[in-house]
Amino acid sequence: IGDRAFHRDARVANMLAKSLMHGLLRAGMANCGKHFPGHGFVQADSHHAVPVDKRSLKAILADDAKPYDWLSTSLASVMPAHVVYPKVDALPAGFSARWLKQILRGDLGFQGAIFSDDLSMEGAKVAGSAVDGALAALNAGCDMVLLCNQSIDGGQAVDALLDGLQTAQASGRWHPDGDSEARR
């Protein structure tokens, strides 16, 4: 993540994040903590590859994810990483109910909205198509899904995504969650 991160030290990152969140709030803007549980220990860029972080859950929670624990009541939203943490789950965090429902919502007590990262990124393609990625993200605990880098097709990708979600709902592959609806 390099220069896109506040700092290597979780305490410093926490202080800087609090300052940014305060400034955003004063300007009338919401905040989003990203990329849960952390993106700092991988070399690969999830825009172009599928990063893998082989650390244990204990190590991740003690380091990268620590600011999420400290800031869970202050964050308006969180965006999970398209990173695989195989010692925790075989799926990238954004497609993992263990990361989103059990750890982020359950263990850390986060109650805000969860946005997927861009489903057109290479790191998201492990789920398959954009529709498959959206279903995986929504079923794992995301409240909203993002398809950001498809603007050159005149909206066809977004239309296909919406059609796919409607078909999935009609066939029972996806059921909108009432709690998730309320967070939107």
Model-derived segments and spans:
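A glycine-rich phosphate/pyrophosphate-binding beta-strand-loop-alpha-helix module
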Residues: 1-4
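Second-shell residues forming the walls of enzyme active-site clefts
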Residues: 8-175
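Short, intrinsically disordered, charge-balanced linker/junction segments flanking boundaries
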Residues: 175-184
